[in-house]
């Protein structure tokens, strides 16, 4: 997965595959509208295990997103986290990007992180307890 260079090429006016907007010109939406297309929710990791079949070191995660249910994610976060440290953690997930099969495992949500100075992924998370499935805005 590579981050978008900018979301201004999306428009909410027409739906593409998986319910995502089709590409459009930059004048079609404001930066705020582009941000609002992403459905970012808070979840809690219920289970984490090494993803042995993945080409890059990864974990299989099962994330409870409250009313959205439990969703799976394949996450390349092995440098800073052990599976046992992930269970019970709150995480932020993009839930409307569509599912993708990663080495036989269906990844339904993208768990969000940011690279540290060494390029290792640091998870994004609220600093207090919040309702599972809560929308990030």
What label would you give each PLM region?
Residues 3-137:
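Phosphate-backbone binding interfaces of nucleic-acid-interacting proteins
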